[in-house]
């Protein structure tokens, strides 16, 4: 990384790019000419290696037919476990604790069905009011399946400022009636990183199992689950991990829980050598593979093979180093160039509390996003008034960040956003 103090000049951006140790990975990705893509926290870009691995698995279907389950470069029968092994270094887990399977919401249903056991006074699930809505939908559903009322048995920690959560408030809410905790690792709006190590330790002091939704952190920040002793986690792979739209998700279960039967069992929960014995009594796998349910979505999984190879080469620590540097650069530029335009920084400024994206707040956010798109910049809008921007370490440049800020300054100065309605599109 370039170590010289921040300067708001174009030349400074070019120097940062010149000293970027990850710059060689930029050519791995398909980037549309004339476009600045800053939405990798919502959907990552396609890499050439991800494209190649998808085509390789299509070819294995073409060449081997049903024998593709055990033949070819990437036999389908073992693909979920292989990708779990490649994912493990990104979350600091053991390979056998990690599996690529299903979708984030389905995996939430799996871990809640497995770990939520309301007994006596311990009947409630602890979450928060800022988490992604689908997590809440799944928790409410699982509570109803236990014959309980979500309004009474789902506790949501309140935010003090509408942007972030206080870990002290979360710990204070870990009362004797809490049976299970599910929290985001990084908040999807503000990008705040929760202290997973501290929260896990505090939950375990009280005899509570705790897990995390990593959708906005995996591939962006390091995790150390073995050290922290986290009980379970779920995530998607299509954001920072660039697995493509509908890419298969991931699941982690601490190996100390491998004696626990999955709450939702299915065809691929089986031990591999027993699966085709066709017995009606399940012999569950003795690793995270037990928490699979149905047949792997092979073609939706395929791009992740190539993508995870890139992450293995780049290293999550190096990616985090650049992410912190380039997001700090974006914040400094915004502060220097956009004063007087009524923007508010909605994300934490401290490095240890900031994830991989920047969250700008403005009363005209929806139509500012539309104006940015009309000028070739791809951000995303989050209600009620947020513009999310992710300069991704693998493929975004400092020059792009500099150009983006100049474009936004022009939009605000010329009031170009007034040409658009201030409401979100169907897909924001």
Swiss-Prot record:
GO terms for biological process: anthranilate metabolic process; L-kynurenine catabolic process; L-tryptophan catabolic process to kynurenine; NAD biosynthetic process; quinolinate biosynthetic process. GO terms for molecular function: kynureninase activity; pyridoxal phosphate binding. Keywords: Hydrolase, Pyridine nucleotide biosynthesis, Pyridoxal phosphate. It is an enzyme of class 3 (hydrolase). InterPro entries: Kynureninase, PyrdxlP-dep_Trfase, PyrdxlP-dep_Trfase_major, PyrdxlP-dep_Trfase_small. GO terms for cellular component: cytoplasm. Pyridoxal 5'-phosphate binds at residues 104-105, 132-135, 213, 216, 238, 267, 295. The modification N6-(pyridoxal phosphate)lysine is found at residue 239. It catalyses: L-kynurenine + H2O = anthranilate + L-alanine + H(+); 3-hydroxy-L-kynurenine + H2O = 3-hydroxyanthranilate + L-alanine + H(+). It holds the Pfam family KYNU_C. Pathway: Amino-acid degradation; L-kynurenine degradation; L-alanine and anthranilate from L-kynurenine: step 1/1; Cofactor biosynthesis; NAD(+) biosynthesis; quinolinate from L-kynurenine: step 2/3. The keyword Mitochondrion does not apply. Its cofactor is pyridoxal 5'-phosphate. Its EC number is 3.7.1.3. Homodimer. Catalyzes the cleavage of L-kynurenine (L-Kyn) and L-3-hydroxykynurenine (L-3OHKyn) into anthranilic acid (AA) and 3-hydroxyanthranilic acid (3-OHAA), respectively. Belongs to the kynureninase family. This is Kynureninase. The gene is kynU.
């Amino acid at each position: 990384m370039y170590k010289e103090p921040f300067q708001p000049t174009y030349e400074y951006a070019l120097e940062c790019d010149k000293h970027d140790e990850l710059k060689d990975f930029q050519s791995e990705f398909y980037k549309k000419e004339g476009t600045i893509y800053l939405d990798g926290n919502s959907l990552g870009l396609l890499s050439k290696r991800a494209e190649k691995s998808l085509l390789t698995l299509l070819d294995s279907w073409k060449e081997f037919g049903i024998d593709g389950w055990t033949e070819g470069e990437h036999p389908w029968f073992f693909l979920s476990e292989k990708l779990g092994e490649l994912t493990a270094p990104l979350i600091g887990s053991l390979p056998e604790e990690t599996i690529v399977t299903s979708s984030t919401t389905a995996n939430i249903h799996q871990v809640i069905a497995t770990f939520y056991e309301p007994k006596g006074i311990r009947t409630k699930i602890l979450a928060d009011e800022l988490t992604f809505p689908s997590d809440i939908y799944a928790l409410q559903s699982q509570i109803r399946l236990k014959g309980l009322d979500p309004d009474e048995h789902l506790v949501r920690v309140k935010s003090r400022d509408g942007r972030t959560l206080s870990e002290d408030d979360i710990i204070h809410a870990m009362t004797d009636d809490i049976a299970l905790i599910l929290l985001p690792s990084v908040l999807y709006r503000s990008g705040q990183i929760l202290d997973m190590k501290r929260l896990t330790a505090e939950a375990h002091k009280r005899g509570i199992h705790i897990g995390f939704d990593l959708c906005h952190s995996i591939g962006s920040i390091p995790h150390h689950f073995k050290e922290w002793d986290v009980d379970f986690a779920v995530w998607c792979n299509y954001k920072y991990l660039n697995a493509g739209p509908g890419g298969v998700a991931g699941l982690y279960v601490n190996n100390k829980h491998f004696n626990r039967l999955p709450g939702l069992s299915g065809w691929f929960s089986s031990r591999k050598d027993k699966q085709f014995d066709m017995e009606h009594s399940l012999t569950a796998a003795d690793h995270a593979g037990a928490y699979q349910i149905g047949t792997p979505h092979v073609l939706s999984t395929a791009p992740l093979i190539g993508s995870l190879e890139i992450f293995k080469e780049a290293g999550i620590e190096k990616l985090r180093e650049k992410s912190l540097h380039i997001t700090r650069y974006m914040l400094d530029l915004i502060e220097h160039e956009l004063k007087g335009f009524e923007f508010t920084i909605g994300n934490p400024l401290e490095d240890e509390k900031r994830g991989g994206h920047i969250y700008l707040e403005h009363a005209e956010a929806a139509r500012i996003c539309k104006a940015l798109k009309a000028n070739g910049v791809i951000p995303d809008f989050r209600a009620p008034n947020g513009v999310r921007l992710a300069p991704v370490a693998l493929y975004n440049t400092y020059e792009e960040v500099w150009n983006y800020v100049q474009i936004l300054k022009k939009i605000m100065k010329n009031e170009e956003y007034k040409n658009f309605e201030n409401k979100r599109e169907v897909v924001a």
